[in-house]
Amino acid sequence: MAKHLFTSESVSEGHPDKIADQISDAVLDAILEQDPKARVACETYVKTGMVLVGGEVTTSAWVDIEEITRKTVREIGYTHSDMGFDADSCAVLNAIGKQSPDINQGVDRADPAEQGAGDQGLMFGYANNETDVLMPAPITYAHALVKRQSEVRKDGTLPWLRPDAKSQVTFAYEDGKIVGIDAIVLSTQHREDVTQADLIEGVMETIIKPVLPAQWLNKDTKYFINPTGRFVIGGPVGDCGLTGRKIIVDTYGGMARHGGGAFSGKDPSKVDRSAAYAARYVAKNIVAAGLADRCEIQVSYAIGVAEPTSISIETFGTGKVSEEVLIKLVRQHFELRPYGLTAMLDLARPIYQQTAAYGHFGREGFPWEATDKAEMLRADAGL
């Protein structure tokens, strides 16, 4: 029987790159709240004592970049100068300018339905049936670990935790099915006065055990909890952070391909983001319909052109109908032009800051996670 291991990682909301993502999306949300048709490309850089917010925006809205930045950092938990990064004292630099009119003329149209793609590019969507949310298990549980770290930090269960943390989970598979967890890595920033023994016990009992299913843990499972022995210096003091540097964490943990475009800070006219959401919606509905156990869809676009330049689907030998039939069903039931997919998923609204930590996919409540097309797909496929 074929055996293999697969690993995915995640990072907490206090990781420097995720601070940057959340600030970029907080700015985007604030603008969309006033101007749903705004064009926004917001990038953020964080380092010890400073935040630089830049990019290109076309909007009728006015937002307070400094206040949005400080509020976001405060909510994450960087509120003391002894952390090296403090929401109330860090410098906030604003370098936002206007979007190029050359891009605008290629995107905007008299007929909104003919709105062109904001850039060229290729995007992937993926789903499989190894978890209830139709996501790969390694990234699902890697996210769950750092999400739990944040919860027990904020509610005071483990008061010595600090915001920066990373997780990594290695699953063992046999003939494509999960048979256990081979290794778990969890590194968390902490106060200087906590002992390694107390930290290991606290992390194991309040983070790892409540999150990971007991049936997948066994005597051979390996645990690496703060394996360097010390993680006091973290956040933007330890490393600079930049928007868009956690694209695999944001998506499928490496189990699906990635077109290379980041999500955070981009309004829905940017197909890097909106078409990746639509592709997830398509793949999830195909799997939910029982048309495949695994599904990866690729879409591609040309700048200024509404129709996708290509659609392709891979089901890895698990499809119940041909991939040609699936593509026909996708064209019939899903709108993949930029204006149409924005309307289909109701994307022109302030929903993005909440996506910017713990993954954009596999979290109920987002429109691209709905499986409302599954029954129609199944019926039209003749199953």
UniProtKB/Swiss-Prot annotation:
Coiled coil: none annotated. K(+) binds at residue 43. Disulfide bonds: none annotated. Residues 99-109 are annotated as: Flexible loop. Mg(2+) binds at residue 17. InterPro entries: ADOMET_SYNTHASE_CS (IPR022631), S-AdoMet_synt_C (IPR022630), S-AdoMet_synt_central (IPR022629), S-AdoMet_synt_N (IPR022628), S-AdoMet_synthetase (IPR002133), S-AdoMet_synthetase_sfam (IPR022636). One of its GO terms (biological process) is one-carbon metabolic process. PROSITE patterns: ADOMET_SYNTHASE_1, ADOMET_SYNTHASE_2. It catalyses: L-methionine + ATP + H2O = S-adenosyl-L-methionine + phosphate + diphosphate. It is found in: Cytoplasm. It comes from the Bacteria. Keywords: ATP-binding, Cytoplasm, Magnesium, Metal-binding, Nucleotide-binding, One-carbon metabolism, Potassium, Transferase. L-methionine binds at residues 56, 99, 239, 270. Its EC number is 2.5.1.6. ATP binds at residues 15, 164-166, 230-231, 239, 245-246, 262, 266. Binds 2 divalent ions per subunit. Pathway: Amino-acid biosynthesis; S-adenosyl-L-methionine biosynthesis; S-adenosyl-L-methionine from L-methionine: step 1/1. Its cofactor is Mg(2+); K(+). GO terms for molecular function: ATP binding; magnesium ion binding; methionine adenosyltransferase activity. GO terms for cellular component: cytoplasm. Catalyzes the formation of S-adenosylmethionine (AdoMet) from methionine and ATP. The overall synthetic reaction is composed of two sequential steps, AdoMet formation and the subsequent tripolyphosphate hydrolysis which occurs prior to release of AdoMet from the enzyme. Belongs to the AdoMet synthase family. Homotetramer; dimer of dimers. This is S-adenosylmethionine synthase. It comes from Shewanella denitrificans (strain OS217 / ATCC BAA-1090 / DSM 15013). The gene is metK.
